[in-house]
Amino acid sequence: MLKIIIPTIMLLPTALLSPKASLWTNTTTYSLLIATISLQWLNPTYFPHKNMTPWTGIDQISAPLLVLSCWLLPLMLLASQNHLQQEPLVRKRTFIVTLTTIQPFIILAFSATELTLFYISFEATLIPTLILITRWGNQPERLSAGIYLLFYTLISSLPLLVTILHLHTQIGTLHMPTLELTHPLLTHSWTGTLSGLALLMAFMVKAPLYGLHLWLPKAHVEAPIAGSMLLAALLLKLGGYGIMRVTLLMGPLTDRLSYPFLALALWGALMTSSICLRQTDLKSLIAYSSVSHMGLVIAASMIQTDWSFSGAMILMISHGLTSSMLFCLANTNYERTHSRILLLTRGLQPLLPLMSVWWLLANLTNMALPPTTNLMAELTIMIALFNWSTPTIILTGLATLLTASYTLFMLSMTQRGTLPTHLTSIHNSNTREHLLMTLHIFPMLLLMLKPELISGVI
Amino acid sequence: MAAGAGGRSAAEAYRPNRYVSLPAELDPAAYDASPEKRRAEAERLAIRSQLKRQYQLQLNDPHRPAVIEDPALIRWAYARTQNVYPTFRPTPKTSFLGAVFAIGPILFWISVFKADRDRKEKLIKEGKYKRPLSLF
């Protein structure tokens, strides 16, 4: 573990002290090296739980997320090179420092064995993300986006802090392997119910659950590309991961408490998929599709069966990669047309045929085409939900149908159709962009061959 | 034009209906335009040609801007994305829509899931829950 965390922290001096000519090269290759070292965590010889240091440990539901977070940092650096080209050197360094500050906190969050440490690192990822969105976003709406992100997360996590401290005094420890051995503390009283709600709410806002998702379209749309990738691929998964960890504390409460969350998550998946069909903003469409997929993850995490956790894990990883890739593709559009309006970014297939291959692949994985891992995940979740309660199949089936329809809508709007008349020339896709897309799709294709790596079971 | 079946002329056979509006060539009123209509047409033509002139000025400018913006499109996109909440007002229609599509279905699905789960729990407690795919 130290061989990942110490290099990640050392990435900060690298970004601050590298000479100008090799700033991007140094940071990108260094983070790629850290990412390849982190792949060793996928090796399943140490499970069910490997204690690496007294405060961090991995098991099979945190290992894939850790590898994803390490893998994404070089991709974020690759994606940001273009829009930072014109900036002075100091600002480039500041940007890279902000990005790399989030990294150790995310690694700590996913590998924390103590619930308090998880909470601290969960909150600590907020500040650099806020800086990223409000400083480097492109539109004046980024200020309200930052405020929504900050206050939604903070308001919902204050009860979480109170409940964590209260549980610590009651149980005596919050070490997660030990917690599995204690008897459940929460009862069906008002105190117990409110404690359970408080434990869950912060992660429901982060995941996001349908009623609490308002920060997400704003934050995703106004963030720069690295911020969008980070949010979509990692910070949302913090919410899903938190729900999985916290429900082991909640004992008998989930019998009653799971109903509203399940209904909100599944109906929200339907509603946000339908909103996607009416979007005019490309990034907003991808953001709402994130809400839809994470709704399925929340629903699966609330029913707490083996299969549903496994499906939620696979969906989190595959959605992380797919959503990040879609945001990168939307960003390549944005860098050329400086507009996110769908009507203005049409007809790209004759113009940029190689990029349209990546568009096609990203959209095919987004709509859960067999044999991608997205399909494995969605099927597992649908079956687990069906076993839990039969009428859920209506909601999940409709959600899958609407997902396919808005994905095809996005594909046909951006690739086919009349060419934009107001543009005279667009730059050809460069190797950096193709490399970025390759590095996104390559893990997804490989994981198709061995999905046990991310499926959360031994 | 050849007379159709029943001896109707083309103008009588092809009246506008719900799916198809009358094309301008078949509309007799297109040829005797009243002065108000002609003034309105002239105004619309003036607006269109001004917009076209602005567009072509930018298009043929030697120092052309990289992207020629359409202000109408920008206003439309702004109205659809960022101006929704400030222009929202609770009316009977919007309250009804919110209740039917947001609050109602949540309560409905909560009750459906709870009823189904309680039914299953009762069957399990009575020992009557069939598990046809069980491995035991």
From Swiss-Prot, chain A:
Membrane topology of the entry: Multi-pass membrane protein
Protein name per UniProt: NADH-ubiquinone oxidoreductase chain 4
Cellular localisation: Mitochondrion membrane
GO biological process: ATP synthesis coupled electron transport; electron transport coupled proton transport
Transmembrane segments annotated in the record for this chain: 21-43, 58-78, 93-112, 116-138, 145-165, 196-216, 224-244, 257-277, 285-305, 309-329, 341-361, 379-399
EC main group: translocase
Organism: Struthio camelus
UniProt xrefs under PANTHER family: NADH-UBIQUINONE OXIDOREDUCTASE CHAIN 4 (PTHR43507:SF20)
Keywords: Electron transport, Membrane, Mitochondrion, NAD, Respiratory chain, Translocase, Transmembrane, Transmembrane helix, Transport, Ubiquinone
Cited NCBIfam families: NDH_I_M
Similarity annotation: Belongs to the complex I subunit 4 family.
Stretches of the chain forming a coiled coil according to its record: none
Catalytic activity line of the entry: a ubiquinone + NADH + 5 H(+)(in) = a ubiquinol + NAD(+) + 4 H(+)(out)
Cited InterPro entries: NADH4_N, NADH_Q_OxRdtase_chainM/4, NADH_UbQ_OxRdtase, ND/Mrp_TM
